[in-house]
């Protein structure tokens, strides 16, 4: 067992097992295949280096299970997840978060809500103008036809802009928050590919590891551990 690694802990978000760039780098196509490979690395790192990997339960764990079940994941991969990932519910009543962090989050959320409202207003005005212009140019078109034509052009743009304003770069779900709380409780590094989780992990002074780097980090740890053992013996 490697020394100096006893305190290495990681708290994993669902994206640690679903990140497309990691699948491509490891030569796998599905979430199941990536989970299988990552779990093998986690198991080896646990045995050789005492590195422990944790997953918030039930929120993030259930998210991961949902992805795996959708792919009809084999039972042996589920067993690996249940064996090598430490499932734990964050102690939400005992974890202390500075009030300044809470203030920043509420301020950020308020700004996003206001931005979302402006985007909604802009698209309502735009849609109204389009309906007016279409009804003038094509008086033969029926009401429903005009509405459907306008919505098909504006709804996707609105959704993308609204989603970006409200969700990108912030915490927008209970699982996201649980990853940070559990990492804070355990003094663990956060593993994710979510910009919001990364941003607030930095605010909380937590170590952050991008999900796309995590498997290769474990491989590097294990490679140097094996080299050390060869030199030693």
UniProtKB/Swiss-Prot annotation:
GO terms for molecular function: ribonuclease P activity. One of its GO terms (biological process) is tRNA 5'-leader removal. Its EC number is 3.1.26.5. The keyword DNA damage does not apply. Keywords: Endonuclease, Hydrolase, Nuclease, tRNA processing. It is an enzyme of class 3 (hydrolase). The keyword Ribosomal protein does not apply. It catalyses: Endonucleolytic cleavage of RNA, removing 5'-extranucleotides from tRNA precursor. It holds the Pfam family PIN_5. CDD domains: PIN_VapC-like. RNA-free RNase P that catalyzes the removal of the 5'-leader sequence from pre-tRNA to produce the mature 5'-terminus. Belongs to the HARP family. This is RNA-free ribonuclease P. It comes from Methanocaldococcus jannaschii (strain ATCC 43067 / DSM 2661 / JAL-1 / JCM 10045 / NBRC 100440).
